[in-house]
Swiss-Prot record:
Changes after translation: Phosphorylated by KIN28.
Chain's role: Component of the Mediator complex, a coactivator involved in the regulated transcription of nearly all RNA polymerase II-dependent genes. Mediator functions as a bridge to convey information from gene-specific regulatory proteins to the basal RNA polymerase II transcription machinery. The Mediator complex, having a compact conformation in its free form, is recruited to promoters by direct interactions with regulatory proteins and serves for the assembly of a functional preinitiation complex with RNA polymerase II and the general transcription factors.
Protein name: Mediator of RNA polymerase II transcription subunit 16
Family: Belongs to the Mediator complex subunit 16 family.
One Pfam short name: Med16_C
GO BP terms in the entry: cellular response to heat; negative regulation of transcription by RNA polymerase II; positive regulation of DNA-templated transcription; positive regulation of transcription by RNA polymerase II; positive regulation of transcription elongation by RNA polymerase II; positive regulation of transcription initiation by RNA polymerase II; regulation of establishment of protein localization to chromosome; RNA polymerase II preinitiation complex assembly
Domain of life of the organism encoding this protein: Eukaryota
Ranges of compositional bias, category Polar residues: 76-92
Ranges annotated as biased composition (Low complexity): 63-75
Key words of the record: Activator, Nucleus, Phosphoprotein, Transcription, Transcription regulation
A single GO cellular-component term on record: nucleus
């Protein structure tokens, strides 16, 4: 029994799409992993959709004004013709209309390959209909990634351009629609689908190893250019598919066009009608190859019993003399070779072909030839056999060519060293892989870097395609001699493994997760998918902590270079850390520190970098990702500062972004107003002025948060001065002691000065009521019980003192301890005394201590206890059952996303949420950190300076899809 290979696809963004074969009114589901309480996760309640061949004819009344023109395109023999069709309206009297049929989904494909972002989804049904969807985009605006929009539909013979937002079936009007079950095989069904990457290169982390000369782990990362067929910038996307009948469909869209196009051609000459009718392919694979703009097509025909190879070449027809003239691409098929199957193995056992898998090789490989894996079932045994081949151009020696063609211009005196590459190809056989169990599925992971075999006993083994060694045994077979040792290519290298999974007969589909840190499984008798995190059996041995932490850190970096969201790795790491914490809490904290230290090293980030470098680090994406992981792993503990330090850094980054962005946009608005000053009747002038002052208005909640935060830090200083042994209020050690947090606070104070200066220099006089936003912002900042100037001087002096200290002794270990745990190492105990004493002299002595101490600093939301409801703020099930819990096991009143988080403040804008904002269905939640926000939505009139119909874009628009922690935002149901 072979498992379905493409019935599920996990996007880089974190959205999981899978086939629904059981519902009476839906055939595809969307879900994602969602953090419930910072510790436990769940699969978000799946949204069910129905995709049927007539979907392009449906028009929802409420969104008809935003739909694009409906057109059709037909393709015959490589030519493309377009025509306009009408759009019938289905949705009114559904009871009187004939039923519409929908079919089982045969394959699902996110655009995850290479540099693609993972936001488009191709869904194929068993008849061969293909529906193209996009996430995070409505016809009129950007939206969150869990929202689907159809962009076109291909019903085998025609392509229908029709942009339409899709609704889950539970939000549709009743329809006369039913699933049509069919046992018939269709020669138009799609066997293989492949996305084509863009022309962008990617960074690939190949491995890390322990360098004994420096006593650290070093990683090797390399930039890899695109290979195979990749589309130029004037193409928005491109993809292709092979059908059972050998038909190749090639879809694409120009960047400056709304229309989607299709080119069709046949794999073989089908002039013979009888041959055309009987041609059935059982397997087909499309693989990038290193010939310029070429893909390798591998097929196996039931009729011929041959494996055949073809080269597909795409010419994008770029006009060098007229680059603005865009021509349709042209496709050409070239037959390479064909070979028969081996009937028996070396011992005479009959072989039965089970699967065909082709692994691509990038241009940086020593041998970039694609590798063909032919999987056989060895009959009358329990074994499987994988035969490995390389398809490579034939290499001819000069000596041979001299004999074959004496007239060739070859240096006969040096002919032994000359090798010539033929236009022909040959199959080179490599060593076979004998597997002691029956294989039910083969998949590739990490851009073909690994190949996983799924066995009928519920186990999975992953091999590195560079050396074909079992990844979980990589360290066991390594020599510990030499400069480099402990070579790690993935978390599996350190011994993390998938364990035993449900047996295939009970499984609808299963797949190794994107970061290779777990397996997602859907069983027939289960309502939701399940996730089995990779586990390390030998977690009790402290000596293994360093290599386990390094392996997880390297896996995280490897995933981020591939733009993978990596929540599967987070869950595996948290599971491992919690298992350690049950044995030794202190050891678990050190494990997190070791992991994060490796992350900084692999990203080449130094926590004590010079100011000019630190200014770039604090706004970088790698730091954001490091802080996300620190936040997620730190939430394993209560009463610790690991998670709080990460939240503080992320909040400070957000505040800095807000003030910096407003300062720049305010300058731009002033220039616009100045240019239009002579046009007093210009209707856009008021809009520009309003937008300018609305920018300032948007800073007021952020300014309030920052004032409250500085006050909170000073409160902690006061408490520690009076009780230096107090362990509850030591977060301030990390914030004042770590260079990164000091740099962020100083940068914010600098941006605040810029904003206040520009507001004072350019008061709004044309419409005085609008100037109230400037007045109120200055009032908020001036009411701080802590003098900002004194506070800034204090931080600058601390910086100088620490720089002098660094010259005397290394500072990396101190910085890591402060930045991760907010703890001062014992050998640096005098640092804590200095911070308290100097803060007392430089800050508190100039402030009203009573006013500071009794100031309200609630609502800062820098700890998990302020984010999640207390009813669920604990480990919700025994760790042995995993960190992912079924929604049905949660308390009844805590089964919705809204019930997980405290809905008091917008965690991006720092503004207090109104009752209407909470209940209007536009509130978003972060799937990773649990933040709630309305960022990216239209600002309600009661949140602007004066009520107006003007819709402005504020700085939080950047967080329409992604949270300040970089986690995915989704809309919570009202």
């Amino acid at each position: 029994m072979m498992l379905g290979e493409h019935l599920m696809s996990w996007s880089k963004t974190g959205i999981i799409a899978y086939s629904d074969s059981q519902s009476s009114n839906a055939n595809i589901c969307l879900t994602f992993l969602e953090s419930i309480n910072g510790i436990n996760w769940r699969f978000h309640t799946p949204q069910k959709y129905v995709l049927h061949p007539q979907l392009h004819e449906v028009q929802y009344q409420e969104s008809s004004s935003t739909l694009s023109t409906h057109s059709t395109t037909t393709s015959v023999n490589g030519s493309t013709t377009a025509g306009v069709g009408s759009t019938p309206n289905f949705g009114g009297n559904s009871n009187k209309s004939p039923p519409q049929f929908f079919y089982n989904i045969s394959s699902i494909h996110w655009n995850n390959w290479f540099s693609l972002p993972g936001d488009m989804l191709a869904v194929c049904d068993e008849l061969g209909n293909m529906t193209m969807l996009i996430t995070g985009q409505r016809p009129d605006r950007a939206t969150t990634y869990e929202k689907l929009t159809m962009v076109f539909q291909d019903n085998v013979y025609k392509i229908y351009n029709h942009v339409m937002p899709l609704k889950p079936v539970d939000k549709l009007k009743p329809m006369n629609i039913e699933r049509k079950q069919t046992r018939k095989e269709y020669n138009t069904s799609i066997l293989e689908f492949r996305w084509l990457t863009s022309s962008k290169s990617v960074i690939v982390s190949q491995f890390c190893a322990f360098d004994s000369s420096s006593n650290t782990y070093r990683s090797r990362a390399q930039q890899v250019p695109p290979y195979g067929v990749y589309h130029p910038p004037f193409i928005k996307y491109a993809c292709l598919a092979i059908r059972k009948n050998g038909q190749i469909d090639f879809w694409y869209q120009f960047s400056n066009s709304k229309d989607h196009k299709k080119i069709t051609l046949q794999l073989l000459d089908t002039s013979n009608q009888r041959f055309k009718d009987l041609q059935w392919l059982e397997f087909a694979r499309i693989t990038p190859m290193n010939d310029d703009q070429c893909m390798l097509i591998t097929t196996y025909s039931k009729l011929s019993k041959n494996i055949s190879f073809y080269k597909l070449h795409v010419n994008w027809n770029l006009n060098a003399t007229k680059p603005n003239v865009l021509n349709d691409p042209s496709l050409k098929i070239q037959f390479i070779l064909s070979t028969t199957l081996d009937p028996t193995d070396d011992e005479g056992h009959v072989l039965k072909l089970e699967n065909l898998h082709v692994v691509s090789k990038s241009s940086i490989e020593k041998d970039p030839s694609p590798e063909i894996l032919v999987l056989y079932n060895v009959c009358d045994t329990s074994k499987s056999l994988v035969k490995r081949y390389r398809l490579a151009p034939t290499q001819l020696s000069a000596e041979y060519l001299v004999i074959l063609k004496p007239d060739l211009n070859i240096d006969r005196n040096n002919s032994t060293n000359q090798i010539f590459q033929s236009r022909r190809y040959n199959l080179r056989r490599h060593s076979d892989i004998v597997l002691d169990k029956k294989v039910t599925l083969i998949t590739s992971e990490m851009f073909d870097a690994f190949v996983s075999f799924y066995f009928e006993d519920g186990t999975i083994e992953s091999y590195n395609q560079n050396d074909w060694k079992l990844e979980t045994e990589r360290l066991i077979s390594q020599s510990q001699l030499g400069k480099f040792k402990n070579i790690i290519a993935s978390p599996l290298s350190a011994g993390f493994n998938y364990g035993k999974l449900p047996l295939p007969p009970s499984v609808e589909w299963m797949k190794v997760s994107p970061s290779m840190c777990g397996v997602i499984v859907k069983q027939y008798n289960k309502k939701w998918p399940q996730f089995y995190a990779a586990v390390q059996k030998n977690y009790a041995d402290p000596e293994k902590d360093s290599i386990n932490a390094t392996a997880l850190a390297f896996g995280y970096v490897k995933s981020l270079h591939k733009q993978i969201s990596a929540e599967d790795l987070t869950i595996a790491a948290k599971t491992h850390i919690l298992r350690i914490s049950f044995l030794d809490r202190k050891r678990a904290k050190e494990f997190i520190t070791t992991l994060l230290k490796s992350l900084y090293s692999f990203f080449n980030i130094s926590p004590d970098a010079p100011k000019e470098i630190m200014d770039k680090i604090i706004t970088s994406r790698p730091l954001q990702k490091i802080m996300l992981l620190q936040l997620e792993l730190g939430s394993c503990f209560s009463q610790e500062n690991i998670e709080e330090m990460a939240r503080v850094i992320l909040y400070l980054k957000n505040v800095l972004f807000a003030f910096n962005g407003v300062a720049r946009n305010f300058h731009f608005a002033i220039e616009q107003i100045s240019n239009n000053s002579n046009q007093q009747q210009n209707p856009k002038l008021f809009q520009t002025i309003f937008s300018k002052q609305d920018l300032i208005h948007s800073l007021i909640p952020v300014a309030k948060w920052f004032v409250k935060f500085i006050t909170y830090l000073t409160q902690e200083i006061l408490i520690l001065i009076n009780d230096p042994t107090n362990k509850e209020y030591t977060l301030v050690h990390g914030i004042f002691g770590a260079k990164m947090s000091r740099t962020l606070i100083l940068s914010i104070l600098n941006e605040i000065k810029k904003v206040t200066q520009i507001v004072a220099k350019f008061p709004e006089t044309s419409y005085p009521i609008l100037n109230e936003s400037s007045t109120f912002l200055k009032l908020v900042l001036s009411e701080s019980p802590v003098d900002f100037e004194k506070f800034e001087t204090f931080l600058v002096d601390v910086n100088n003192k620490f720089i002098a200290l660094c010259e005397q002794q290394p500072s990396q270990e101190r910085e890591f301890s402060l930045l991760v745990k907010a703890e001062i190492p014992p050998e640096y105990a005098k640092v804590g005394d200095f911070l308290l004493q100097y803060a007392n002299n430089a800050v508190i002595s100039h402030a009203n201590a009573a006013a500071v101490y009794f100031a309200d600093t609630s609502g800062l939301k820098i700890s998990n206890s302020e984010f999640f409801n207390p009813e669920i703020f604990h480990l919700l099930q025994p760790l042995e059952e995993g960190l992912i819990i079924d929604t049905d096991k949660l308390p009844i009143k805590n089964r919705t996303s809204k019930s997980f988080s405290k809905l008091l403040y917008d965690d991006v804008t720092c503004d207090k949420l109104s009752v209407s904002e909470i209940s209007d269905g536009k509130l978003k939640r972060c799937s990773r950190c649990g933040s709630v926000t309305r960022a990216g939505n239209i600002i309600s009139s009661d949140k602007t300076i004066v009520p107006t119909s003007i819709q402005t874009k504020r700085w939080p628009t950047m967080y329409t899809r992604l949270c300040i922690c970089s986690g995915m935002l989704f809309e919570m149901d009202g």
